[in-house]
């Protein structure tokens, strides 16, 4: 789904929680790093850990670093539209931005991050930027591909770098990324579109455990077995197409069961879907479309 206003999306995420005072809460830590506050006496009520800026809640990764539990994807955003979109998203509280070599927008995204930091909107260390390298020539010559991502983004370091898909030389490419972690140029590593068989093959061959696996997840493609397996490895699950994948989006967003749930709780259907992800301990990154001019 496209979201035309990044502030609205973050707002609907936050409004889905049950608001209770800190004194009424106890904090629950899961082995996979996810943290929730549970209302004492009301175990079905969960509140986010929020600050006064209304930023998204954060989760602990398996390397001790933190990442927002909600973010935005930038697939299909190009040129000035990408700059405007990312800058506006940061201005409105987003701190998790996803891109990739294949999106062709890393340079504009990096420029927006630098501008937001220069304008005092946020600090660089508060932003999590994810990018990816792609199978084929980039896996065959990963050092070059990784350095190109660093140069195009030009934001000092990359927070999380992923392998976009499994493929020939994926272990070689990941091991190259590990060297960049050791050099301080990348902070965390991850993988995308990996399922149980690929994970069982891949994980024993690498030294640095991925902090996240980014897969297609939504109510019409729940993939519970895969999600549970990834969580069992102490790895965060991140959902692309969280509001419905190709061929499912319009159907999901008009689903009568979800509509009934939304009406019963006085929420929008999108709020219900995002809450579903959050309560499954899945990080949602809906795709953003925003073309308002930067000012």
Regions found by a protein language model. Name each.
Residues 1-3, 7-11, 22-52, 59:
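Residue-level recognition of alpha-helix boundary/capping or hinge positions
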Residues 18-20:
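N-terminal signal peptide c-region/cleavage motif recognized by signal peptidases
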Residues 57, 165-295:
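Beta/alpha (TIM)-barrel catalytic core signal, keyed to glycine-rich beta->alpha loops juxtaposed to Asp/Glu
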Residues 75-81, 100-108, 135-140, 166-170, ...:
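Acidic-and-aromatic substrate-binding clefts and catalytic sites of carbohydrate-active enzymes
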Residues 142-162, 179-183:
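CE4/NodB-like, metal-dependent polysaccharide N-deacetylase domain
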